[in-house]
């Protein structure tokens, strides 16, 4: 049961889904925001890319995911770290501690409570924009998605609609909420072909010139249970 629980949480983040709904309480500091209503899609994308041109960033996150067929909703929160290219670290604090790490080549999922780590090949889990991989390099948005700027938008935000160029059951549609003031990606909503929904809201976003590479690697220790994630994925 524990192993199934771990896989459930992995697929929530890596094979996510979501729908276009607005989170209450989402703030963009619009009082001091410049008038950006005239910007074209290309101009918005260029500003996002420029804003995230530093090597990495950190943020706190809250995540709500729903598996429609099972009528299950799961919520989680923690802190995330992103670094070009392809490096990510998601530290889940609630409801259970677990850490999802990738250096772009290898994926580690560690549960401290069970002293257990699952190891797999990162590309098979992150290809085609899965697993929020574009957050480690915002230029991937142009490369992996067909993008439109939504006409109906929430005050203080641009809303981008992303359709994967490479069709997959795991991702059908993604929406990004972009602050008109800072050009931070403050919210992500996704859904898959099964109608499953995932919402991620970022707060306290901190752009970093440098994040230590040790954050994006993992070393096993004596006595730790090691499982092959690629084998489990193929079953």
Regions found by a protein language model. Give the residues of each.
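Flexible, surface-exposed loop/linker segments and immediately adjacent secondary-structure boundaries
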Residues: 115-157
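N-terminal leader/targeting segments and the immediate start of mature chains
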Residues: 21-73, 220-235
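Short beta-strands and strand-coil junctions in structured, solvent-facing domains, enriched
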Residues: 68-69, 89, 96-99, 109, ...
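Gly/Pro-enriched, hydrophobic low-complexity segments
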Residues: 140-230
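Bacterial N-terminal signal peptides
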Residues: 9-19
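An acidic-aromatic
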Residues: 79-129, 198-199
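Extracytoplasmic
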Residues: 54-56, 75-77, 83-85, 95, ...
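Bacterial N-terminal signal peptides that target proteins for export
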Residues: 1-8
């Amino acid at each position: 049961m524990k192993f199934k629980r771990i896989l459930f949480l992995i697929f929530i983040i890596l094979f996510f889904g979501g729908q276009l709904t607005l989170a209450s309480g989402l703030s963009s500091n619009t009082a001091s925001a410049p008038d950006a209503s005239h910007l074209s899609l290309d101009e918005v994308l260029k500003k996002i890319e420029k804003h995230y041109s530093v090597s990495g960033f950190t943020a706190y996150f809250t995540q709500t995911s729903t598996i429609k067929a099972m009528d299950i909703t799961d919520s989680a929160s923690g802190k995330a770290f992103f670094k070009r290219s392809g490096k990510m670290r998601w530290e889940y604090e609630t409801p259970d501690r677990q850490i999802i790490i990738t250096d772009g080549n290898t994926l580690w999922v560690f549960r401290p409570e069970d002293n257990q780590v699952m190891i797999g090949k990162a590309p098979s889990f992150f290809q085609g924009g899965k697993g929020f991989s574009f957050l480690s390099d915002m230029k991937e948005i142009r490369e992996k998605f067909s993008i439109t700027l939504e006409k109906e938008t929430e005050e203080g935000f641009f809303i981008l609609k992303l359709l994967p160029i490479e069709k997959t059951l795991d991702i059908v549609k993604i929406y990004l909420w972009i602050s008109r003031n800072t050009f931070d990606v403050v919210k992500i909503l996704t859904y898959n072909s099964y109608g499953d929904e995932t919402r991620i809201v970022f707060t306290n976003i901190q752009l970093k010139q440098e994040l230590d590479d040790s954050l994006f690697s993992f070393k096993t220790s004596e006595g730790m249970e090691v499982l092959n994630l690629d084998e489990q994925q193929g079953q």
